[in-house]
Amino acid sequence: MRGERRRRALVVVLVVLGLVAVVASPAAALHAPTHRRGPSASRSGRPYPCAPGPDGTIQGPNADASAIGWEGNAQGVVACLGGSFYVQDGIDTTYGYGVYDDTKTTWTNVGGYLPALRSTFHRAGAEISITNFGDDVQLASGAFVVVYSRVAIHNATSHAVMIDPQASPRLISLNLAPLRVGPGATVDHDYVVAADRFGQTTPWPTAGALQAAGGYDAHFAHMQAFWVAQLASIAQVRVPDPGLDDAYRAGFIYTQIVRSGDHLDTGVNGYASEYSHDVIGILANLFTQGDFNGAHDLLLEARDVVGTQGQYLDGYWTYSWPWAIYLLKTGDLALVQANFSTEGPDGTSTPSIEDTAHRIAADRVGATGIMGRTDDIDTLGSWTVDNYEALMGLAAYRYLAERVGDASEASWAASEYDSLLAATTATLDATIHRYHLRYLPCSMTDPNDFNRCSNAEDANWAAPFVFGRWAWDGALFGATITGPGADLIDATYDYGFGRLKTTLPANTFGGYPDDYYSSGYNAGYGSWGLASAAHRDQGIRSYEFMIQRTQSGPLSWWESVSAPNPASPWIGSHPARGQGSSPHAWGMANANKVLLDSLAAERSDGTLIVGRGIPSSWTRSGRSISVANFPTTDGHTVGFTLATHGLTVSWSSIGEPTTGPVLLELPTFVNNIRHVTGGAADRRAGTVTVAPGTDHVVVELAHPA
């Protein structure tokens, strides 16, 4: 999908006779008319549009789209600007408030990251905010995702104002609030509507049942507590850019809302389905973060997806990768052994880990021995990225074979890896020599001028750098990293950005037809930068670009976007068009993985790499970085802080003591270490090696960062 394709419930006990009644049709009692409270001095209007467009993708007229809902809901709710939202699950209806009139608006996640989206604007001297969120509500009739909505009107004037929220007729009132708002006062209008049934066919609840299930504040508190607890279970980050902290948290939450049961869908609209390589990338990131909730079912669901979907072969080849991360982090050898060489109930359509690795050998072609032609970047070709993905799959498979004690398969994987690496290197060397190239081409056999990468703004020029995984993630699993894919990383970044210098801002890689400004994978394209010398912080810089320039919902991004629309009512820089889905779970997975990898990454031998991708500006005096609850080998976790005071950078371990070596590899350390206390320095490489169990290291710099 790089171009043109594509509970912890608040239990409510209802004891009032009749309140547990349900109806079969959502158009009846579920959507009872809003209680009207007299005339309003405000003009009457329709809610801001939020509905499917000609291509079926749900969004607002300014390409605005995000999501609210609950973990594992069948169909998340699409949220748009101005407090409007679109409920799916057979209801297929837009809800919103006519009081919103497309005036200049801020649109944010409450608390910076929660899936409670707030639009704030001004009218008649009043500040009006509309907040929507989803909560998991258990009624006697079943489990539901219920949307709670508040229109808060604050009168900052010295005279009374009359403002009617003008709620959609089928929204259900939760309180009787006046339309008159006195000077300096705030009035809250609260509403509710059921939105999802977790894939069941349970009849929808009545208006009375929803009203009796509790008010806005109680459900907000439950929603907030749930997501805070979920975030506490994964690796936590704090960096000098708080926008990245919030994006990391919001990305995890959106992924859980986009998820439909055990199906790791890519979006709640547009791409509301599973795609093989998307699922692999999403799962790899969740395991890297330390989210193993339902891991067994998710791994087997991924098996079913890669085994039956013929669209993308690379998902099949890399199926071993999330398994390897899972085993490294959890030590759950029994689960891996049970699925290593044993197929699922449908034979090769539910392949074993071994099946997927051996498919790599079967898919190599011709005298060159490279991977065959695929449509993995949504255009048929002999793509460089495919060969590096296959190498990644083999590296992960070798690790798994060694861990389960299958010496024969480990030997086969090592031999196949060496053979494919040699073939890849020879073919690329020949292409580079024949056409006098100074970059890694996106095709194995042709220069970029001969294919879709001739368009400088087509981000596939950097496809190996995110989807290939190999140069960075392969190295983490002990793979040999040599050849053009290792040698030309910096040169290829320079080449690609050089072509974009006159057409696009810095730190965007371009997009896909016909929205070439940027993409949801923009941060992920910096992944191979972690294996480079000069672009180690590219992932973070490109993530910051996404936050500053291309949000299409609060901390939510389309797969591909056009340039910003200055006429949008949403204050800031936001794309005029988008395609795919927003939020986009695979894009967020790549962004959050490169952020976390830039701060902390673990090798399969237990070595912890710290700070390899952090910008030098983050180590200026007075700044600090922390990582907590980072998952390491066999179920352990570690944490640390990095703090700079003057020319001194201090690393301190928090939580469990480290059990393996720690490598402090901050870019600012390269040729800039004066003295180290608590570790051994390689000044030229800029690496400080810390022995296991050490809890404090001090590095004195020669020059300021």
Each predicted region: which residue ranges?
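Non-catalytic carbohydrate-binding regions of carbohydrate-active enzymes
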Residues: 408-450, 483-646, 653-656, 665-677
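Amphipathic, well-ordered alpha-helical segments in soluble domains
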Residues: 87-88, 92, 115, 291-294, ...
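Secretory targeting and sorting signals
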Residues: 2-31
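Terminal accessory carbohydrate-recognition/targeting modules of carbohydrate-active enzymes
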Residues: 30-245, 604-705
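Ser/Thr/Asn(+Pro)-rich, low-complexity disordered segments
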Residues: 17, 21-24, 145, 173-216, ...
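Substrate-binding groove/exosite segments of carbohydrate-active enzymes
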Residues: 222-347, 372-374, 379-382, 455-482, ...
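The feature captures the catalytic groove of carbohydrate-active enzymes
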Residues: 180, 184-216, 309-314, 358-419, ...
